[in-house]
């Protein structure tokens, strides 16, 4: 079509030139050549423009637009609670990670053997969930600290759960758990692992019946978890709700946790952590530690736990370190505005923590605790000892402040008491029970 327009144009120009030449006496051949060249260049430019437009349209038709959402069902997922959808999720992640886009998960129950969502990715990635996940019920040992579902080395990641449930089906695993005999508790999968995430958000997900820990946050920086649910019965052994370690700038804002171990456990290398508006119970409370079990542990610094409700748990807020430990540090810690409801040992520092007898009993812990503030703690204690501060003989606690504590016990043993060892706390405000009226001893 361009060719026919080109020929018509050339003929028209030649006629005009010839007429002008006859009138002005200018050589016809030179004028005609110049006119023909101009028309040909115009035609080439037009053809190039048309061809470029066609190529662009072809690219859009033949390939997915960068950043477009990837539907996991388009990648082959069934969501029928029976088919293993692991391969479909892997394919969807590969596509979304390469483009920096969103994965959408429609309603359904997705059975997955295991999943690995690994970066780095080309750009920010969002996982938008409207379905639930279910693990196999069978018990399989894994490499230490492995996860059922892993998110690893991703920046600017968002997980919008929309109340999605990750069901680890752990009841058979709890029966097979032999931690009490061996002290080895890491051969079962963690429900969800977040490793090496930066500038990321985890919103509105629930982990149920994990075979081991529910969530593990390791080597992360600047991530926020909100509207988190953890649900497992009290008999689920070693099912810490959310464990945080070797991470900086983690914010846990809003969680309801019921489990068989610590609701929140804070491991070595944790810095600048905020835990806020957490409801905990049943479980073992909110704990820093245990620390000092392994060599080369990193300091814990800048931990704030505030505005929490702890109910029907074995402990409230506590710091626990192993006797006979290598040197370590935990400092700049704040427990504030926390309500206890029928909690055993609501406030506890235990530097002789020795579960299952796997420790060097009688050898002082070398983890130094300092600059700890325990403020605004109120409610009821299920045990007569409501505050127990048992620090290390080797490196006694320093700058431990107690302020505005009101914990009551209505049992047959009498009113609540406070027991201390190797510590001279800084006291302020009203303290019930009165501080350090008894000597702290190992044991519950």
UniProtKB/Swiss-Prot annotation:
Function: May function in depolymerizing pectin during pollen development, germination, and tube growth. Acts as an exo-polygalacturonase.
InterPro entries given in the database record: Glyco_hydro_28, PbH1, Pectin_lyas_fold, Pectin_lyase_fold/virulence
Official protein name in the record: Exopolygalacturonase clone GBGA483
Molecular function terms from GO: galacturan 1,4-alpha-galacturonidase activity; polygalacturonase activity
Gene Ontology annotations for the cellular component aspect, listed alphabetically: extracellular region
Swiss-Prot/TrEMBL catalytic activity: [(1->4)-alpha-D-galacturonosyl](n) + H2O = alpha-D-galacturonate + [(1->4)-alpha-D-galacturonosyl](n-1)
Domain of life: Eukaryota
GO BP term (any one): carbohydrate metabolic process
Keywords: Cell wall, Cell wall biogenesis/degradation, Disulfide bond, Glycoprotein, Glycosidase, Hydrolase, Repeat, Secreted, Signal
Localization, UniProt: Secreted; Secreted, Cell wall
Active site per database record: 261, 284
PROSITE patterns: POLYGALACTURONASE
Disulfide partners: 263-280, 391-397, 420-436
Major site of localization recorded for this protein: secreted
Glycosylation: residue positions: 222, 342
Signal peptide interval: 1-23
EC number, UniProt record: 3.2.1.67
Pfam families named among the record's database cross-references: Glyco_hydro_28
PbH1 repeat residue numbers: 220-246, 247-268, 270-290, 300-321, 330-351
The family this protein is said to belong to: Belongs to the glycosyl hydrolase 28 family.
